Amino acid sequence: MALFNDEEQQRIRVAIEDAEKHTSGQIRVCIEKTCNEAVLDRAAKYFHKLDMHKTKHRNGVLIYVATVDRKFAIIGDKGINKVVPPDFWDSTKEDMLEHFKLGDLVEGIVTGLEIAGEHLQKFFPHGAGDTNELSDDIAFMDGE
C-alpha cells in the first residue's frame, strides 16, 4: 500500500503550487521510510540530489520526512537562509509537529508548505519571467 493515496498526493501537490504562486521560491517535499543518518545530513543529500541548489535565486526549500523513523527536517538554500529569521525553520517545524503528533502526516506537510510559501513571498515575491524551476511532485525515495 502506498504511503499516500492519490487524493493525498494531489493535496500536497496543490499545496506546493499554491505556496509558489506568489513567490519565486521553489519548494519540494521528499518522503522516505527510514533515515539512517542525521536527519539534516539526509535532507541536505536529497536537496542536492533533487538539484534544489540550482535555482536562479538559490531560494529552494526542502521538506524532508522519514515516515517510519519519525524524523523530519526543513532546509533552505543560501538565498533564503540570508533573509529569514534564525528560528524560522524551528517555528515552522513546531507547527508541523503538532499535526504529526495527531497522526496527520498530510496536514502537517501542508501546514509546512503554507507557512514556507507565506514567508517566501515576503522575501522573494513572484516577478515577471519567473518560472517553476522544480517539479511540484513529491519525491518518494527509498534509501538512495
Task: Label every model-predicted segment.
Residues 1-144:
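A structural boundary signal for the start of the first folded domain, especially the loop/turn
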